[in-house]
Amino acid sequence: MTILTTLIKEDNHFQDLNQVFGQANTLVTGLSPSAKVTMIAEKYAQSNQQLLLITNNLYQADKLETDLLQFIDAEELYKYPVQDIMTEEFSTQSPQLMSERIRTLTALAQGKKGLFIVPLNGLKKWLTPVEMWQNHQMTLRVGEDIDVDQFLNKLVNMGYKRESVVSHIGEFSLRGGIIDIFPLIGEPIRIELFDTEIDSIRDFDVETQRSKDNIEEVDITTASDYIITEEVIRHLKEELKTAYENTRPKIDKSVRNDLKETYESFKLFESTYFDHQILRRLVAFMYETPSTIIEYFQKDAIIAVDEFNRIKETEESLTVESDSFISNIIESGNGFIGQSFIKYDDFETLIEGYPVTYFSLFATTMPIKLNHIIKFSCKPVQQFYGQYDIMRSEFQRYVNQNYHIVVLVETETKVERMQAMLSEMHIPSITKLHRSMSSGQAVIIEGSLSEGFELPDMGLVVITERELFKSKQKKQRKRTKAISNAEKIKSYQDLNVGDYIVHVHHGVGRYLGVETLEVGQTHRDYIKLQYKGTDQLFVPVDQMDQVQKYVASEDKTPKLNKLGGSEWKKTKAKVQQSVEDIAEELIDLYKEREMAEGYQYGEDTAEQTTFELDFPYELTPDQAKSIDEIKDDMQKSRPMDRLLCGDVGYGKTEVAVRAAFKAVMEGKQVAFLVPTTILAQQHYETLIERMQDFPVEIQLMSRFRTPKEIKQTKEGLKTGFVDIVVGTHKLLSKDIQYKDLGLLIVDEEQRFGVRHKERIKTLKHNVDVLTLTATPIPRTLHMSMLGVRDLSVIETPPENRFPVQTYVLEQNMSFIKEALERELSRDGQVFYLYNKVQSIYEKREQLQMLMPDANIAVAHGQMTERDLEETMLSFINNEYDILVTTTIIETGVDVPNANTLIIEDADRFGLSQLYQLRGRVGRSSRIGYAYFLHPANKVLTETAEDRLQAIKEFTELGSGFKIAMRDLNIRGAGNLLGKQQHGFIDTVGFDLYSQMLEEAVNEKRGIKEPESEVPEVEVDLNLDAYLPTEYIANEQAKIEIYKKLRKTETFDQIIDIKDELIDRFNDYPVEVARLLDIVEIKVHALHSGITLIKDKGKIIDIHLSVKATENIDGEVLFKATQPLGRTMKVGVQNNAMTITLTKQNQWLDSLKFLVKCIEESMRISDEA
């Protein structure tokens, strides 16, 4: 974009502005948003100061940020995102927005140069006093001394929470001399201390808990946007007590008890750990002198204000909203007199003392003394929308007027296409710039602004894809993610005390933890399991692979089995029979398909390439891979039968559309079968829009079509006039005949009835079939189906999908009103989820009184199908603002303009349901909001509380996400394998089921499980060899290490585990050293055919297998073991060698030496 800034920089108008910008109060008029951004960016580039850009709200801030990223390095661009809504202070904060705020405050506190975009609400918000914030900026360097207690104390002040193992953002742990911290910004880090000196700093992977790279120094940012010290708590207690005593007599008696509960709920008086998320609502009482963000800026900062009058309007409504919000919470006993979140001074007062540059599109009167007014003449660019003739005449006009023409396109390939298009129009153009650009020609560069603009006085026009092709999307340069990807789904196999487990031989029990028991004078660790009644089972940790976590649907509580009973055997036999049946069915289908002859497509045509280049978005890697897999299938002679899985909005439709286009290009017809009329309509519109420039005849068959239209479509399918038909089950009626059907696309097959599924089966005969589903298919199942069912998976979301901001809060009409107003004010729509059909119309009336001007519709499952469809369609077409609905919206409806979801009684829903419902919003380029409400002052059941806690962690990462994924995976398995399998999965747990299925499939395919070459080794030594709780306190970590030890087969693995133990837990004690010795002995034994090493008190018995006895070179062994002298005796029993070792001092070392010698004495067999 340097060409643009160069042209601007040389212009006299800009130079006039540059002289007074930041020097005196100036009004700049006439500039469109993108032109204004270009000027501000150039001013920033030329100065060494901080620049503050104030907008009226966050939406505006986001828009300007996207354009500014084209000119300013992301490292120097900061935003202070505060929602335009009070409710935010009362709900769980989204870590994304919080980390952005912290990044901004930290940069300001450190005096960094940057361009800072702050919405009005952010400017007025009460913040931690600047000095306190500065005192809590920490940089740690290797070699420095730290006071550990003081350091840990500071972390707590900064909002970090102490845990035994760090797995989430905002946590820290202390183990021995190792401190782990997971900051809000950047990688998790591990600090190793030598007494009080920092010996090393490393970043580590949360997934594996292993260190990665050494670093010399690290900045630790706060984990909350408020600092809470002991002093702050002391001050807060006094202020809150006064506020409580002041409020109590002034409110209605009926709510005084509620006020008392609110007051006590902050637990200020008995707790030592304070939840920053909750205390933030008391910010007005926290600090003696709180700051606002303006106090964080340098004194010479440059200030630019975007649309002053709009800011004043927002300020007015903000003040009114804030007042009514505070008085509402006071009247309902949820707040105190004196509570506030923003400074009430006028906007102008806040920025007093700074020379300000005001940008306004139109000349306007302002109550401010202005020193300069600079007027620009700026015009919008005509929208061409791909109309070639208009485009040519406009470009010709620019050339004739000697304009500098800058054309911005979003990808490199489009640069070449654009140049070819201009040369067809005889417009001179260049794509590479050498020094200066002459006027009267176009320069085509990669870049993107929200809109084009024309500055006639400068002789400059900037044209973007939006004007050229009505491009829907504007690419944003990727911002560095504030939250690292280290928190991807951690295995949901983590065992917690109380979890249900499945023991392969004993069935379903409950995990009670790891216990160290003394058996025969030696200490060992055992996994303690609870079975039916009082039965308990202790499983030695070296047999832990027989125990799996029981994973089934969220609402299923399994029945505990009885130890020693026969019910588990019967259950397993039933499931075994069922998986064998399924395996057989799958294999038969697969063989039948392999034998079938279908149509073999050729390579992609030129039209296909053009069609694919027309797609306005960048494909995700998963989409591209899926498309390649589908095309490969189509180019084979056997018919395709592929299942494409991908979350809602991840771009499955585009993949299907490309397959459909390929089929049509070879003269084949395509049937696109969907479960609902609405989806049919949406897919139909997508196809029409994508294929408008190509000679493809597309028709729709659904209830929205007249009998006459349907008759014509049927006729067209028969004669071959219709290329693609989209429809509901109407497509399955027997009187439909295709001239040459080549591809059948089925969306969400599991939602069709049995009769329809049978009909789909007959249609599939010798035709390529692509089935789409939004329910994820589990990885393990995916693996066991390899070779019997073709699966493509889209797991990556499209770029620039904003994470949905999720709030969990108590039900309160003022919160609801505020959320509704906010969405409607940005011309959006709202899903209001209310799951009680009997009172849904009363709820609508209640909302209508709250929002008299809104159009509100109702949708629920007891309406007739036609009414429901018409309501949904009207909502999609923007005829209603709010849809009060039951969970009927859970599947398949796409309303890009609905970006707020409010769910009443969220505690009654399953997590996977909430996860899918939340996927309804945030599907366009706007931020989506989801409010999960739970009844105020209701005592929640433990499961509901856990569920809400999990939802709080929903922000794409935490355990809530894992549970939802787990539940959906099981649902996906049920869909793929048939409904009754769902029940079987629930009886034995998902993992055991997958394992049994995989074995059955392999057996039916004739794939033998590779027989283990190496026999099991039993090592039984009377030694204290275990992981003491003093060394590893966290049970999950303990189990994880035991699992690794159990799987160890090489010395490299042993060295790796030793490194890991020292890395994560510091130097290990003697019990752990012995445990590692035993594993080392086992590894030697594995490699040398030893089957048993048994401690018999004074001697140790070693048994070799017959095969190992044949392979051993006795001469080499005797020579090597001479140092052991008479302590070693050799014998033979049943053709197998036995060795006894008499115990002496250091006998463990002698044993290690002996097994090593046995391994080295093995003859290498020639068979290889």
UniProtKB/Swiss-Prot annotation:
It comes from the Bacteria. Its EC number is 3.6.4.-. InterPro entries: CarD-like/TRCF_RID, CarD-like/TRCF_RID_sf, DEAD/DEAH_box_helicase_dom, Helicase_ATP-bd, Helicase_C-like, Mfd, MFD_D3, P-loop_NTPase. GO terms for cellular component: cytoplasm. Keywords: ATP-binding, Cytoplasm, DNA damage, DNA repair, DNA-binding, Helicase, Hydrolase, Nucleotide-binding. In the N-terminal section; belongs to the UvrB family. SMART domains: CarD_TRCF, DEXDc, HELICc, TRCF. GO terms for biological process: regulation of DNA-templated transcription; transcription-coupled nucleotide-excision repair, DNA damage recognition. ATP binds at G646, D647, V648, G649, Y650, G651, K652, T653. HAMAP family: TRCF. SUPFAM superfamilies: CarD-like, P-loop containing nucleoside triphosphate hydrolases, TRCF domain-like. It holds the Pfam family MFD_D3. The keyword DNA damage applies. GO terms for molecular function: ATP binding; damaged DNA binding; DNA helicase activity; hydrolase activity. Its main location: cytoplasm. This is Transcription-repair-coupling factor. It is found in: Cytoplasm. Residues 808-969 form the Helicase C-terminal domain. A motif (DEEQ box) lies at residues 747-750. The gene is mfd. Coiled coil: none annotated. Couples transcription and DNA repair by recognizing RNA polymerase (RNAP) stalled at DNA lesions. Mediates ATP-dependent release of RNAP and its truncated transcript from the DNA, and recruitment of nucleotide excision repair machinery to the damaged site. Residues 633-794 form the Helicase ATP-binding domain. It comes from Staphylococcus aureus (strain N315).
